[in-house]
Amino acid sequence: DLDKKQDDLHEMLDLILDYVEEPQVEQEKPFAMLCTLLASDKYLGRCLVGRVEQGSAKVNDNVKAINLLGDKVESGRLTKLFKYEGTDRIPVDSVNAGDIICIAGLAETSVSDTICNEINETPIKSTPIDPPTMSITITVNDSPISGLEGKKVTSTLIRERLLAEAETNVAIS
């Protein structure tokens, strides 16, 4: 009933479950997932988030990343696997098609790259990331009031902050 005020979203979520089809997954095919998000962990480094489109994978499996053209970006090993359940990230030993996961072990892979087993040559279709539209040049501040406003304004600290942000932000390259 649209006129009645609701306390929660249960009715809407039930409608979504009733009318939205489940995603089609292919368990039999070799492992493949599309990287849709970058994450960073202070112990694991760069992590990649996405949904497993097909197959399954285990910790220590050898995988490769390929770009939208099918060119190899890098090879590596799945050092850690996490599965998302709601907003919780839970460490697991294996993942299957349909799971939303986070993986560690690939440092050069980015959003829109396909992570797959080593025999797969076909990338998952995705929208390419737009190239940067702006660039900046940072130079030494030779103003007479340099260093008087702000605490972290040295070039080294700014560089460290930009590199840290580039780990999880695809808009910075």
What are these regions (language model features)?
Residues 1-173:
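Structural and coupling elements of P-loop NTPases
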